[in-house]
Amino acid sequence: MFIKGVILSSYGVNGYARVKSISNNFCDFINLKDNKVLLKKNNGFTIEVKVVDVNIKSNSLYLKFEGINTPESVKSLIGFELWVDDSLASSLKEGEYYLGKLIGYAIVNDNRRLGEVVSFFEYLNSVFLEVKVGIKFFFIPFLSIYIGDIDAREKTIELKVLDLLR
């Protein structure tokens, strides 16, 4: 499963939800029509819903879910993350990664395990990996100046700059 977006607000009177795309690629959302998705809240609450319509207007994305027909119903879903099956995830180009899939990867340098990716977050136009080293946590910018090879088979991420873990 992959996170594809977050519900931001209701839109109109018919129960549409305005959604922020995690990938900023709206085209892939068209494939969600007539498919079930999971809406997850960070408190662990999960709802399975069917997407019945996808609408893109003025650089904004709107989804309509089966059985959710009023703005009030959508308001209770604000902040929920939209999770989709792997088969509905956006396609990736060479060198692109689903950040959620990097959770659990080992951070290595010279084949020495230093820590583990436990989370990630986006701030402005930057992505940071949260890495646990022993009992400490560090944030590593997800940039090629700091991050080297990512090995999906070995589930490792090379750290080029060790000073980021001090």
Swiss-Prot record:
Keyword list, A-Z: Chaperone, Cytoplasm, Ribosome biogenesis, rRNA processing
Cellular location(s): Cytoplasm
Keyword flag Cytoplasm: yes
A single GO molecular function term of this UniProt record: ribosome binding
One of the record's GO cellular component terms: ribosome
Coiled coil region boundaries: none
Keyword Metal-binding recorded: no
Domain named PRC barrel: residues: 94-165
Pfam families noted in UniProt: PRC (PF05239), RimM (PF01782)
Protein role: An accessory protein needed during the final step in the assembly of 30S ribosomal subunit, possibly for assembly of the head region. Essential for efficient processing of 16S rRNA. May be needed both before and after RbfA during the maturation of 16S rRNA. It has affinity for free ribosomal 30S subunits but not for 70S ribosomes.
Family the entry assigns: Belongs to the RimM family.
Domain notes: The PRC barrel domain binds ribosomal protein uS19.
Subunit relationships: Binds ribosomal protein uS19.
Name of the protein in question: Ribosome maturation factor RimM
Source organism of the structure: Borrelia garinii subsp. bavariensis (strain ATCC BAA-2496 / DSM 23469 / PBi)
Gene name linked to the record: rimM
